[in-house]
Amino acid sequence: MAKKSMINRDIKRTKLVEKYKVKRLELKKIIKSINVSDEERFQATIKLQALPRDASPTRQRNRCALTGRPHGFYRKFGLARTKLRERTMNGEAPGLSKASW
């Protein structure tokens, strides 16, 4: 089980990412546009840097929904490998079964 503080920190980051998502996209669009002057591009870059660091989506971490484990995470199920295996063995994961050949 991950520390509650780490799980809460990731939840806080997720909220910040959602809050600033539109603003970040607009600023990035200005920065990448070739029709914008250098001064406007520079101002957009400064505004982007002024946004909170945790508002960047790359600072988010995928975590298991049950344990908060950050490694061995399967996006399709939202679970870490250990919990996914437990669910599979109990028949709780739809479409999964232990391989045998």
Curated annotation (Swiss-Prot):
Q: Does the keyword RNA-binding apply?
A: yes
Q: Which GO terms describe its molecular function?
A: rRNA binding; structural constituent of ribosome
Q: Which SUPFAM superfamilies match?
A: Glucocorticoid receptor-like (DNA-binding domain)
Q: Name one GO cellular component term.
A: cytoplasm
Q: Which GO biological process entries does UniProt record here?
A: translation
InterPro entries, per the entry: Ribosomal_uS14, Ribosomal_uS14_bac/plastid
Its biological purpose is as follows:
Binds 16S rRNA, required for the assembly of 30S particles and may also be responsible for determining the conformation of the 16S rRNA at the A site.
How this chain assembles, per its entry, is:
Part of the 30S ribosomal subunit. Contacts proteins S3 and S10.
- List the PANTHER family hit by this protein, alphabetically: 30S RIBOSOMAL PROTEIN S14 (PTHR19836), SMALL RIBOSOMAL SUBUNIT PROTEIN US14M (PTHR19836:SF19)
Q: What is this protein called?
A: Small ribosomal subunit protein uS14
